[in-house]
């Protein structure tokens, strides 16, 4: 589908979900008797949310059987994943990805990925971004656009914010105490999920206790599972980057949640929570590409603990509605244990014995963080000053400690040599600041929102915690970052159905420890630190139109995000000697000064970027529009399209291609069963939108030249059809099932291709493009789950 098709498609969706429907709702509401009673809703811990927030609630998590981040973004437009083979580095929103998209759990941000491209191409570190098992989650807010007012550093292009379950979420509606048991299976990675939880909600005590376990294998590629290579290999099941099927892997993860809140009396409430996840993914990297006689097996490990204590006071006051104090603690570990070696050679036959593996090295590389924070929040009662104001003030102080520690074993002639090292100095980061927001209702038509936040961040390198072979031994000087962020918005409620609005939000990201301080000194090239880095900045403008009525809903957003001070890994070429003079020519006296080149890398603020786009989402209750259609039938449609521009020669590769989703759903009025369908169109990435820079020479001894070229691996467009549903034989038992990629289309997503490395021992294909089949999306696959509450 060409971009020019966007306007007719938008007009079509607008005509389906548009004015006549909601105008009828508004007219009906004006003539109908005033018998409708709205239920009172109490909101705690509210977000200052812009219009472009996609909330995935517990019902949708269960209905769509969301098991991981790929499932989460499956039916979301303009949201992708930062995918890098063995590792997922978070999300891609509004043209940026990875550390530029914030991820938080109950308001506590997860740490950045600290790996740079120097080490990424070798695969010895675990560069994954931590997450949380959806089994522990009740709401997920996908914020599309800058959002540093709410989440601080990192929400440059948006954020994904998880809220953990409460006791009520585990109970039947009429129960105060109950048990929930859930089992599920997914064929795409042969994964079993087993969950058990206990919940209490009796008015005074709200408590939840839950444990979940996942066990599975590699994700299939177009119906192909991963198998270990037999002998020298044949067909698609071979070793090296041309391998055509996934690398075999096994994973096992444990997740838990313990949460309790106690209402001491009408005005005072206390609570505590603890949640965490730990596990590993063991991969036999048959696609490892060092040399044909080399092998590697990798065990990627992650561990996370989040704890919280809080106190709430709701005073009997004419101006103060809430005082809340929080203490948060987080500890994380992302590690990779790599087993490497050679296949031995039979010196009688001079054949490689692929059935044996000789261990040469075991690398245990770990990135650890510890985080502490204290927060105080004050919310006002509605205050009258030209309109109704609701003020919220927050102040906070935090400290995050980061360190890298590597424990490596080297095997030689039956002996083991053990070393402990690090690649950079530990860093302590302190942050303090405050924020103030105001939600204003001016009259029955106009409302506005505004907020401002100040952050002061100090990064202090510490003494080395182990030997560092290729870095400066003296801790660098501390770095300080200060700045303001905020939001402002104005909305008009045109009638009971339609609302229009404009929002501007800002974001920032403080460079992480690796970007500022990492050094690597080597004769062929250095990685230089840059203590003069600035924080990345962004702002997002959003024009929104929202319609709500008994016949359906429509959300339309036009947006533009601007980025500046973009951090980029820049290369500086240093040359000496006579061009064309090789070492061999010098040896034979044909020239006197051999030519040498050295590439130095350094993080620099150089780029600006802009992304513009449109998002449309609509739902239509067919029985409210067409009289002969039974109750329960619904139409769904969603479109996302974006166009980006990056200063310089490169493209913003993380910009998502066109995505269109349409569906027909039926849910019985008794809510006993339902069937849902989704047809997704995934647009192709165009070469002109995928430009990148390489340095190449034309032969030995010739100078390196900068070249801008098309990204070599572009996805084609594809249609994918899914069906899923549920059935409740009794009120406390729910069976869910789904079939995905029903017509078994063979396709590849842009997210899976843009993470490939051109020159690497891992997550790569060969120079002829062989091995791309390994990155195809799963073929026809299914998932089932059974949930029992009692």
Label each residue range with its predicted role.
Residues 27-170, 289:
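Acidic, small-polar-rich N-terminal luminal/periplasmic segments of exported/outer-membrane proteins
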Residues 222, 508, 559-565, 569-571, ...:
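C-terminal beta-signal and adjacent terminal beta-strands/loops
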């Amino acid at each position: 589908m060409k971009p020019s098709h966007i306007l007719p498609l938008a007009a079509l969706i607008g005509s389906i979900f548009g004015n006549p429907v909601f105008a009828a709702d508004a007219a009906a509401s004006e003539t109908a008797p005033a018998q409708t009673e709205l239920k009172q809703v109490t909101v705690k811990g509210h977000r200052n949310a812009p219009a472009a927030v996609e909330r995935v609630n517990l019902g949708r998590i269960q209905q769509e059987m969301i098991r991981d981040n790929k499932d989460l973004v499956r039916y979301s437009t303009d949201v992708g994943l930062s995918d890098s083979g063995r590792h997922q580095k978070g999300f891609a929103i509004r043209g940026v990805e990875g550390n530029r998209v914030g991820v938080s759990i109950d308001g506590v941000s997860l740490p950045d990925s600290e790996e740079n491209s120097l080490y990424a191409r070798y695969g010895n570190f675990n560069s994954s971004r931590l997450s949380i098992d959806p089994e522990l989650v009740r709401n997920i807010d996908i914020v599309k656009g800058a959002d540093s007012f709410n989440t601080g550093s990192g929400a440059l292009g948006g954020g994904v914010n998880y809220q953990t379950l409460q006791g009520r979420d585990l109970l039947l509606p009429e129960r105060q105490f109950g048990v929930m048991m859930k089992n599920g299976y997914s064929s795409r990675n042969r994964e079993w999920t087993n969950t058990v939880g206990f919940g209490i909600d009796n008015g005074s005590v709200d408590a939840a206790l839950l444990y979940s376990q996942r066990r599975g294998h590699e994700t299939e590629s177009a119906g192909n599972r991963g198998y270990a290579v037999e002998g020298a290999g044949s067909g698609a099941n071979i070793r090296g980057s041309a391998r055509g099927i996934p690398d075999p892997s096994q994973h096992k993860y444990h997740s838990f949640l313990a949460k309790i809140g106690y209402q001491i009396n009408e005005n005072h409430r206390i609570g505590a929570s603890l949640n965490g996840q730990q596990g590993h993914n063991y991969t036999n990297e048959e696609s490892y590409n060092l040399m044909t006689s080399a092998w590697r097996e990798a065990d990627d490990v992650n561990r996370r603990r989040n704890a919280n204590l809080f106190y709430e006071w709701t005073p009997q006051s004419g101006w103060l509605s809430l005082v809340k104090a929080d203490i948060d603690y987080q500890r994380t570990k992302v590690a990779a244990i790599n087993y490497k070696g050679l296949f031995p050679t039979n010196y009688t036959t001079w054949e490689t014995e692929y059935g044996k593996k000789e261990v040469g090295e075991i690398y245990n590389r770990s990135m650890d963080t510890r985080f502490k924070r204290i927060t105080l929040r004050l919310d006002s009662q509605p205050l009258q000053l030209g309109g109704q104001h609701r003020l919220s003030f927050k102040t906070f102080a935090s400290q995050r400690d980061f360190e890298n520690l590597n424990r490596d074993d080297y095997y030689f002639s039956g002996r083991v040599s053990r070393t402990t090292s690090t690649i950079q100095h530990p860093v302590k980061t302190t942050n303090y600041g405050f924020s103030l927001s105001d939600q204003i209702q001016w009259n029955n038509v106009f409302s506005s929102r505004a907020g401002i936040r100040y952050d002061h961040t100090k990064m202090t390198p510490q003494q080395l915690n182990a030997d560092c072979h290729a870095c400066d031994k003296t801790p660098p000087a501390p770095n300080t970052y200060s700045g303001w962020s905020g939001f402002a918005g104005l909305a008009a409620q045109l009638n009971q159905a339609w609302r229009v609005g404009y929002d501007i939000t800002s974001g920032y990201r403080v460079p992480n420890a690796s970007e500022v301080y990492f050094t690597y000194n080597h004769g062929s090239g250095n990685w230089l630190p840059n203590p003069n880095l600035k924080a990345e900045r962004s702002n997002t403008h959003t024009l929104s139109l929202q319609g709500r009525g008994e016949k359906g809903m429509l959300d339309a957003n036009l947006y533009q995000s601007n980025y500046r001070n973009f951090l980029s890994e820049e290369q500086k070429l240093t040359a000496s000697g006579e061009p064309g003079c090789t070492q061999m020519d010098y040896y034979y006296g044909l020239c006197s000064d051999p030519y040498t080149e050295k590439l130095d890398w350094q993080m620099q603020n150089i780029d600006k970027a802009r992304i513009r786009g449109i998002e449309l989402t609509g739902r239509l209750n067919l029985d409210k529009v067409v009289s002969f259609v039974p109750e329960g039938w619904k139409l769904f449609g969603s479109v996302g399209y974006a166009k980006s521009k990056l200063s310089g020669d490169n493209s913003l590769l993380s910009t998502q291609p066109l995505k269109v989703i349409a569906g027909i759903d039926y849910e019985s009025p008794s809510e006993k069963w339902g069937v849902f369908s989704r047809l997704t169109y995934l647009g192709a990435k165009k070469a002109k939108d995928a430009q990148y820079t390489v340095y190449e020479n034309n032969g030995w001894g010739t100078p390196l030249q900068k070249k801008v070229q098309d990204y070599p691996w572009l996805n084609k467009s594809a249609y994918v059809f899914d069906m899923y549903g549920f059935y409740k034989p009794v009120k406390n038992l729910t069976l869910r099932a789904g079939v995905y990629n029903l017509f078994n289309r063979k396709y590849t997503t842009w997210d899976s291709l843009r993470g490939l490395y051109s020159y690497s021992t891992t997550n790569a294909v060969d120079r002829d493009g062989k091995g791309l089949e390994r990155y195809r999306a799963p073929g026809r696959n299914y998932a089932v789950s059974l949930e029992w509450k009692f």
